[in-house]
């Protein structure tokens, strides 16, 4: 399992098709956005420079750092065409933050013939759990879900 992974800045192998050029928002950044309560649109992300995007990937995820990130994103996006990124309530108590294995993730694993136990779930890093929850949610195309299961359940 990957419980020792740095959840703040780790990018998954299944994200390799856009790492480097950062044409999509990687899951490590999406997790930080949820934690600091910012709705950053893809248009906002794409308007940022490569260096700014990399800085968001590398940004730490401690409490103080997340508050600084929230303000930084307000400042960066204020002059953008889509306007300032919207504030949301910071996520607390989300399924990926819980010890219980979410039914949607369990069902997605079962459908794909993947064995995922509660013990495995509790040993995953918060970022791993975040990725599985995001990729397994209804309405998502599930394009990278099998690769995500393979990567995080090693």
State the predicted function of each range:
Residues 41-48, 56-59, 117-137:
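A structural feature that tracks compact, well-ordered secondary-structure segments
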Residues 2-53:
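The feature marks the first
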Residues 40-87:
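Acidic (E/D-rich), amphipathic helical modules within compact regulatory domains
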Residues 34, 74-127:
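Short, solvent-exposed interaction modules
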Residues 133-154:
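Glycine-rich, aromatic-bearing surface loops/beta-hairpins
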């Amino acid at each position: 399992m990957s419980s020792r992974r740095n959840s703040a800045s780790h990018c998954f192998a299944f994200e390799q098709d856009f790492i480097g050029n950062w044409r999509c928002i990687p899951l490590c950044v999406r997790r930080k956005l949820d934690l600091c309560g910012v709705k950053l649109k893809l248009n906002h992300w794409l308007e940022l420079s490569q260096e700014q995007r990399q800085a968001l990937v590398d940004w730490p995820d401690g409490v103080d750092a997340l508050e600084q990130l929230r303000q930084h994103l307000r400042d960066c996006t204020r002059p953008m065409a889509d306007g300032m990124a919207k504030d949301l309530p910071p996520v607390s108590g989300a399924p990926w933050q819980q010890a219980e294995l979410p039914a949607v993730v369990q069902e997605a694993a079962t459908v794909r013939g993947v064995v995922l136990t509660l013990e495995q779930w509790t040993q995953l890093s918060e970022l791993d759990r975040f990725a599985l929850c995001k990729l397994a949610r209804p309405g998502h195309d599930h394009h990278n879900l099998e690769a995500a299961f393979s990567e995080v359940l090693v």
